[in-house]
Amino acid sequence: MIIYYLKLEGFNMKIKYVAEPFRIKMVEPIKMLTREERELKIAEAKYNTFNLRGEDVYIDLLTDSGTNAMSDDQWAGVMKGDEAYAGGKSYFKLVDAVKDIFGYKFVQPVHQGRAAEKVLFGLLLGEGKYSISNMHFDTTRAHVELSGARAIDCVVPEASDPTVRIPFKGNMDVEKLEKLIKEHGADKIGVVVMTITNNSAGGQPVSIENMKETAEICKKYNIRLCIDAARYAENAYFIKQREPGYENKSIKEIIKEIFSYADIFTMSAKKDAIVNMGGLLGIKEDEELFQLCKGRTISFEGFITYGGLSGRDLESLAIGLYEGIDENYLRYRIGQMEYLAARLDEAGIAYQSPVGGHGVFVDAKSMFPHIPYNEFPGQVLAVELYKEAGIRTCEIGSYMLGNDPDTGEQLKADFEFTRLAIARRVYTQAHIDIMADALITIKERANTVKGYRITWEPPILRHFQASLEPLK
C-alpha cells in the first residue's frame, strides 16, 4: 500500500493522517452480522438501506445528519437547558450565537432544516414560480414542488464529470442563472438557493467569488438569495484552503463574508452544528418577512422561542455552532475524507473529485459500466457495501432524482453516486480503512453484479420508502 504523508502544524514529524483532536469518553458497542444474516436483512428491507434497522448496521454512513457525537460541553449544556415554553434563556443564548457567527438580525429556531424550508418556501413560492439553485437537495426540491413551484438546478457543468478536479465544483453557473431569469421572468423567480456545500454534487464547495457574482445577479433582478447552510463551516474551510486571498482569514471571518451576500439562510443544524436535532431560519434584515415566518412557525413548529425544540436542544445547538467552526476540528474532519479518497485513488476507484466535505461520493457508474441509469448503479453499490461489510450508505443519482412530474418517466441524473457520509466525531481511522477495503473488494467482482428495479414507490421522495428487487 502506498503511504501518503503530510506535515501538520505543531508536529516536526511526518504523519499519515490527521488524528482525532479529542479523547473518547463514552462508547457505544456495535455488532457485525454474518454475511448470510446481512443478505437476509437487506432482502427483508426490500433492498432499501433506509429500511434497515440501525442495530443491524456495522458502520452507518447513510447520513451525517443528526448522527454526530456531541462534546462534553454540549452534554453539560443539555443539563442546563431552560425548558420554559416562552422566553427561555437557552433561546436567547442560541440567538446571540447566530448573530455573532452569521451577522443576521432575525433568527428562528426550528426542529430541522426541512422545517425552515416549509416555513419559508410557502411564503416565497407557489404555482407558476421557480426556485433556481446550484443544486437543490432532495427535501429542498420536495418543498419547492409541494408549494406548486418548479425547481431548476444550475450548477457549473464541471460538476457532472467526477474526474474533473477544480477547487469549487459546487459553484452556481452564473451565466446560466441570468439566462434562466430572463427566460422565465424575474417576477417568476421566487428565490435563488445557494447550497453550501453542494451536497448533491458530492459535497463540493462554493467560492466567495461565486457567492458575490450570484448575489449581484439577484440584486440586479430584485430576487431574494437564500443560503442552504447545512454544511457552511466545511465550505468556509475549503475557501480558506483553496481560494486565493483567504488563507490568512479565520473561519469565522470567512463565514461572515459568505452570509453577507445573502438575504436569508435555512440550516439543518444536524450537520455542522454537531447536534442530533435542530435547525435555523435566519433573515438578515427583512422584518416584514420575519414576522410572516414567525406566524407560520407557531402553526407548524410551536412557539417562536423554542421552534419545536426542547431547551436542552437549543442549549447544545448554541454550543455546537462554535465547536463546528473550530479550525483544528475542521482539519481533522476534512482529513478523514482526504485519507479515504487517497485509498480509493490508489485502488483506481473513481469518486467525485476533489473530495468534498462530509463524505466521499463514489462513482458507481464507473464501477458498474454495464448497469444503466434506470437500474440504479448507485443503489446497487449501496446494497453491495452492506452485504460486504455491514456498511450502510445511500444513493445520490437517478434513483433519488425520481420521475418527471409531467410525463412520469424516469429522469436520468448527471451522475450516479453512492454517498459515504461520515458522521462527525464518531468513527476512527480503523473504520475508514474498512470502508476503503470493502470498496476495493467489490470492485474486484464488479462485473458479476446486476441492477435493480422498483416494485413500489411513493409519489414524493421515493428513495426513503421505495421497495426494490434485483434483476435476474
Swiss-Prot record:
The modification N6-(pyridoxal phosphate)lysine is found at residue 271. Its EC number is 4.1.99.1. One of its GO terms (molecular function) is tryptophanase activity. Its cofactor is pyridoxal 5'-phosphate. CDD domains: Tnase_like (cd00617). Pfam families: Beta_elim_lyase (PF01212). It is an enzyme of class 4 (lyase). This is Tryptophanase. Transmembrane segments: none annotated. It catalyses: L-tryptophan + H2O = indole + pyruvate + NH4(+). Belongs to the beta-eliminating lyase family. Homotetramer. Keywords: Lyase, Pyridoxal phosphate, Tryptophan catabolism. Pathway: Amino-acid degradation; L-tryptophan degradation via pyruvate pathway; indole and pyruvate from L-tryptophan: step 1/1. The keyword Metal-binding does not apply. The keyword Transmembrane helix does not apply.
